[in-house]
Amino acid sequence: MTEELQSLVDSIEAEAQRDRPAADTPEIGIVMGSDSDLDVMAGSEEGRPGAYDALTELGFAEQTSYENPPEARFTFETYVVSAHRTPGLMYTYAETAADRGLDVVIAGAGGKSADLPNMTASIAYPLPVIGVPVQEKSVDSVIGMP
């Protein structure tokens, strides 16, 4: 694991140990396996809304720092975590999600097997994980999620 990746894992684990008020933590986590999934998860230039667009339309704000949360009452965070390329980060993200204040995770499924939403759901249980097909070939796997 690279130093940068280990630093991110350590930061997520440390945040899970802090006892922050609910108003200072995001309610929703958005994860995707690759930055190439960002167009679908955030919203595309062609005007198709993504999870980011939907949440901001509902009044949520993106929270990029626990130390300086946005003024909005409802917030979300966005991470790129791969079940294949960064499994340690994905595991830490899912395992600490509830302790970091998340109420739900929205996970983009980029491949046929929907590994990211399925693995995130199995680790973060009982926290709900909503799988979003990023590609057409992901639809069947996401529909088949428990």
What does each model-identified segment do?
Residues T120-P146:
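Short, acidic/small-residue loops that bind anionic groups at enzyme active sites
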Residues R18-R85:
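Glycine-rich phosphate/diphosphate-binding loop of Rossmann-like nucleotide-binding domains
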Residues M1-T25:
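Haloarchaeal acidic low-complexity proteome signature biased toward cell-envelope/secretome components but also
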Residues D37-M41, P87-L89, K112-M119, S138-V142:
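Short glycine/serine/threonine-rich phosphate/pyrophosphate-binding segments
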Residues H84-V105, M119-T120:
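N-terminal small/polar loop signature for handling phosphorylated ligands or for N-terminal nucleophile
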Residues D35, V81-A83, G110-G111, P133-K137:
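Short, ordered loop/turn segments at secondary-structure junctions
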Residues D24-E27, A72-F74, R100-D103, A124-V129:
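Short coil/turn connectors at secondary-structure junctions
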